[in-house]
């Protein structure tokens, strides 16, 4: 089990930012850390990886990553990392990149087969697409058979179609090797598909945690559904107002009375829900 209870304070001339978290992740769980930019997600991951220090305690199974007296170096934590930047060796082919991590040709071939990369194993990195490079990065991260895998928004630079395929590959890896996985993401659909545990960070603090259903499905009472959206534009039309909404990659609109419209402005994050036969907007 992964246990974290720590805080880190950042100071500059303008303001102070404190990251303070306490949570646990069971062995084999896929946990997503979700939140807006600047909420502390990547800093949390860097502390967990050993790239930054914090005050408190972090343990994984029987190993102390850090506490008041101990600090285990990143190399000794036996973690796997995958970042948005592939960080692959461009002068090596795919197979060589994996074997650089660990000289285990049998396991390298197993991973290449699992990630549908066998036909590219002699290809150089510059010959690969973005999605293929990220699969190589994932395979290389697994080569040393880590018990804990850290993913820092690894798919954010890829288009949606490629991203969806990579989600399937990642789930297959997770299911096959049962690696405890921590994913940093700000993509609701990605988190919902991949994770069985979600932690939401806001301004350096955990504001909610639970299963994806508990965190993201916010229907209550007689509500039929509730969808997170953002108001792109609020415009007056005759005696009503029209709210133009961004819902994922789709655009929709909802009619509001003048009384309802006064509670909203452009760029507000809202929940679009249905109650009885009416559509409702609620500010988050």
Report the location of each language-model feature.
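ABC ATPase NBD coupling module
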Residues: 64-81
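Conserved ABC ATPase "signature" region
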Residues: 63-66, 105-120, 172
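Conserved ABC ATPase signature
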Residues: 124-128, 132-134
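Catalytic Walker B motif of ABC-type/P-loop ATPase nucleotide-binding domains
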Residues: 149-153
């Amino acid at each position: 089990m992964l246990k974290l209870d720590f805080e880190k304070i950042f100071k500059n001339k303008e303001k102070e930012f404190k990251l303070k978290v306490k949570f646990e992740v069971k062995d084999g769980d896929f946990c997503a850390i979700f939140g807006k930019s600047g909420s502390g997600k990547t800093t949390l991951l860097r502390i967990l990886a050993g790239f930054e220090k914090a005050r408190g305690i972090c343990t994984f199974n029987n190993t102390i990553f850090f506490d008041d007296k101990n600090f285990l170096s990143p190399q000794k934590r036996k973690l796997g990392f995958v970042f948005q930047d592939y960080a692959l060796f461009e002068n090596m082919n795919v197979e060589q990149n994996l074997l650089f991590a660990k000289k285990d040709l049998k396991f390298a071939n197993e991973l290449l087969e699992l990630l549908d990369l066998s036909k590219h194993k002699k290809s150089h990195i510059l010959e690969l697409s973005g999605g293929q490079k990220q699969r190589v990065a994932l395979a290389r991260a697994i080569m040393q058979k880590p018990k804990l895998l850290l993913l820092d928004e690894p798919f954010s630079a890829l288009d949606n179609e490629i991203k969806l395929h990579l989600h399937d590959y990642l789930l297959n890896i997770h299911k096959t090797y049962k690696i405890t996985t921590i994913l940093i993401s700000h993509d609701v659909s990605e988190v919902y598909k991949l994770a069985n545990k979600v932690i939401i960070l806001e301004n350096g603090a955990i504001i909610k945690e639970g299963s994806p259903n508990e965190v993201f499905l916010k229907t209550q009472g007689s509500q039929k559904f509730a969808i997170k959206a953002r108001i792109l534009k609020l415009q007056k039309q005759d005696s009503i107002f029209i709210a133009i909404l961004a819902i994922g990659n789709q655009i929709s609109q909802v009619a509001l009375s003048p009384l309802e419209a006064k509670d909203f402005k452009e760029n507000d994050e809202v929940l679009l829900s249905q109650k009885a036969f009416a559509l409702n907007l609620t500010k988050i």
